[in-house]
Design a protein with these regions (language model features):
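Hydrophobic alpha-helical connector segments
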Residues: 80, 94-124, 146, 171-178, ...
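Helix-turn-helix
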Residues: 34, 38, 42-76, 80
Length: 231
């Protein structure tokens, strides 16, 4: 359903694991991971509403009471998945930043990495965009885990300002702008309109994201769009 430059593959969780393995096939330590994997597959196939501890236990092929050894309730399960997704996203963003030659390139790379992560791991992103489902008042680790990506983006924005490839001022405002752009692209992609629009434009979501990112970084650096440059 989701395509990134033609041929992505999920790297965060297995999608081809049989839904109902034998009930005696899990050791205690492995069960938690299988419950998370089963939940991710349910979210991608049927949406977040399909996830309950009883349903996840059935998908994992274990006793209905088994999930309670690891998760007190549904929100605890969703919180654990959200924390996992936030950590994986932050790792992807750090890798993207590491290979960028300039701060401006790093900013563009972070936007593309975020959108690519969402395309390859939609179940994680659906949860991360709905933090209230994890009841953050009971699971403060959800908000703490999400701060890593924001902190990283803010650092890159500040690097751009020092480099002269972004306007001076409060970095939090510019960070919010970039974050909103990335989430907007992701939301349009996961909900469907972006792919349809790309078909009309004769491009792909990945290519369109790269073009939008290049336009944004150019504007921040004070460069007009190509069609408006003099000479």
């Amino acid at each position: 359903m989701y395509r990134w430059r033609g041929n992505p593959a999920s790297t965060a969780y297995a999608r081809d694991v049989p839904a109902t393995p034998a009930r005696d096939s899990y050791h205690h330590g492995a069960l938690r991971e299988e419950l998370i994997t089963a939940s991710l597959k349910l979210i991608e196939a049927e949406g977040i509403g399909a996830v309950s501890l009883r349903r996840v236990a059935r998908e994992a092929g274990v006793n209905p009471g088994a999930p309670y050894h690891h998760f007190a309730d549904r929100s605890a399960l969703l919180a654990a998945i959200t924390v996992r997704g936030s950590a994986l996203l932050e790792q992807s963003l750090r890798e993207a930043r590491q290979h960028a030659p300039t701060a401006a390139a790093a900013l563009g790379a972070l936007i593309e990495a975020y959108v690519r992560f969402a395309a390859e791991n939609p179940a994680y992103i659906h949860l991360m965009l709905r933090p209230e489902l994890s009841h953050p008042e009971n699971h403060p680790e959800v908000q703490a885990a999400g701060e890593g990506a924001i902190t990283l983006l803010t650092e890159v924005v500040q690097d751009c300002q020092r480099e002269g490839s972004a306007p001076p001022g409060d970095p939090a405002t510019l960070t919010g702008l970039v974050w909103a752009l990335a989430i907007g692209i992701v939301t349009l992609w996961l909900d469907g309109p972006l792919e349809a629009r790309c078909v009309d434009l004769g491009t792909t979501p990945g290519e369109l994201t790269a073009r939008i990112t290049a336009l944004l970084t150019g504007l921040l650096a004070g460069q007009p769009p190509r069609g408006e440059r003099g000479g």
